[in-house]
Amino acid sequence: MTSKVIYKGSLRTEATHLRSGNTIITDAPTDNKGKGEAFSPTDLVATALASCMLTIMGIKANEMNINIEGASAEVKKIMAAGPRRIAQVIIVI
């Protein structure tokens, strides 16, 4: 098992990475009945994709002895309705 997620009520969850103990809080966004005080679950999906891209770039850069420290990604997530879902993720590296 990698993580454990607990529903805390009020449309909030707490996810714990079991090996390190690090935690992530999620909130439903304000446009979906939430508080919007933390990443939404769909924000994390889009953000995780960008994190994965930078990690893979880092692996290849290390193999090539190239320093990409400070590389960044800007993430834009576009939602669709009926049913509510991620319609598009735009990542600019």
Which sequence ranges carry the predicted segments?
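Extended beta-strand/beta-hairpin segments
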Residues: 1-47, 55-93
